[in-house]
């Protein structure tokens, strides 16, 4: 990636991070950290582990495209096992994954910061078309797994909690929403999603003029990316299922973060309740995707979900605070990784 683009992503992230930090009540933060004790460090370390699941899902998508497509500057296709080595290393991709999520957390609209950064970093290694298709396919898989996670949560709620009429209506609404989301992405996997997403943007006020111009200028590239997405899904369905399972496992295991927080407040915690809290909170927060770091939405989601499970309001506030601090720390780590990648690129050039 060009130096000016790396600096741009880094400066943007730093500015947003500073703004987010200034919104914190530092006395409340200090009291929360004192109360959490070593569990806070367990939460930070947990996410170092969880990001490996995200990286692994993206990595196998890239490896799958490596086996089917020609290397940059080479007209011959790579046959599985014939290429000497994948040009993308796992731990390099881990840094890019963390940095991409850091930019996504800080960007209104979610995918507007991290995905362009990932494409720009990956392009020198595997080419623009394959970098774009692998990033889009991973982003689709990441979102697709959320719908399955919410469906799992609905099933767990039905099996473990009493249901009255208002709750039943809400669960039915979530079920319909998830079914529509899964259908939309399955169609996207078979026919490609890049062109469809740009067409949707072309009908949104504020973005439609840019989207229409982009479609006119890059229609051929969008068609190529969609063809590669469809080909990757059809040629290697095992890779697709593995990537979805890795992302779904990451969603479920990330409920341990809530369990660690609640163990500070109560002697025993039901892990299924933690899954339900995370599912409702993530659904609520994702509906507010246009807010950077989903400020207020995530905390409100924790407050409502804990209250819905007959926990105290203070439990929801405490969990929301610890999760917010963890996000800020990992945003900072992601920005540091951007600078590390920049220095590594300089060394490679020399």
For each of these PLM feature ranges, what is it?
Residues 126-140, 312-322:
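Membrane-interface alpha-helices at helix entry/exit sites of multi-pass transporters
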Residues 101-110, 139-147, 151:
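Mid-bilayer segments of alpha-helical transmembrane spans in multi-pass integral membrane proteins
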Residues 1-98, 165-286, 318-319, 326-350:
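Predominantly cytoplasmic-facing regulatory/coupling regions of multi-pass membrane proteins
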Residues 102-108, 264, 279-295, 299:
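Transmembrane alpha-helix interface/packing and boundary motifs in multi-pass membrane proteins
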Residues 98-116, 209-212:
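Short intracellular "coupling" helices and adjacent cytoplasmic loop segments at the cytosolic face
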Residues 150-160:
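Transmembrane alpha-helix termini and helix-breaking/packing motifs in multi-pass membrane transporters
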Residues 121-129, 300-315:
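Interfacial segments of multi-pass membrane proteins
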């Amino acid at each position: 990636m060009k130096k000016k683009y790396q600096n741009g992503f880094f400066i943007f992230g730093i500015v947003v991070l500073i703004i987010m930090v200034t919104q914190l009540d530092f006395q409340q933060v200090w009291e929360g950290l004192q109360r959490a004790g070593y569990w806070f460090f367990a939460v930070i370390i947990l996410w170092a582990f969880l990001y490996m699941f995200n990286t692994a899902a993206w990595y196998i998508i890239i490896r799958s495209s490596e086996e089917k497509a020609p290397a940059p500057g080479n007209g011959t296709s790579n046959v599985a096992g014939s290429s000497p080595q994948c040009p993308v290393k796992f731990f390099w991709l881990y840094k890019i994954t963390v940095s991409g999520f850091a930019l996504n957390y800080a960007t209104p609209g979610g995918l507007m910061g991290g995905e362009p950064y990932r494409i720009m970093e990956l392009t020198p290694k595997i080419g623009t078309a394959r970098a774009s298709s692998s990033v889009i396919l991973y982003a689709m898989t990441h979102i697709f797994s959320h719908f399955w996670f919410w469906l799992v949560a609905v099933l767990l709620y039905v099996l473990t909690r009493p249901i009255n009429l208002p709750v039943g209506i809400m669960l039915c609404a979530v079920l319909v929403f998830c079914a529509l989301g899964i259908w939309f992405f399955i169609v996207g996997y078979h026919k490609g999603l890049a062109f469809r997403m740009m067409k949707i943007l072309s009908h949104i006020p504020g973005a439609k003029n840019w989207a229409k111009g982009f479609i006119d200028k890059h229609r051929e590239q969008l068609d190529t990316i969609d063809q590669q997405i469809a080909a990757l899904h059809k040629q290697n369905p095992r890779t697709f299922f593995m990537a979805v399972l890795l992302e779904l496992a990451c969603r479920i295991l990330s409920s341990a973060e809530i369990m660690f927080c609640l163990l500070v407040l109560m002697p025993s915690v039901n892990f299924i309740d933690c899954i339900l809290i995370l599912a409702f909170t993530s659904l609520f927060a994702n509906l507010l995707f246009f807010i950077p770091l989903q400020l207020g939405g995530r905390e409100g989601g924790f407050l409502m979900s804990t209250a819905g499970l007959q926990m105290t309001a203070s439990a929801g506030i405490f969990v929301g605070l610890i999760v917010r601090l963890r996000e800020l720390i990992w945003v900072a780590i992601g920005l540091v990784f951007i600078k590390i990648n920049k220095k590594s690129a300089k060394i490679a050039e020399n």
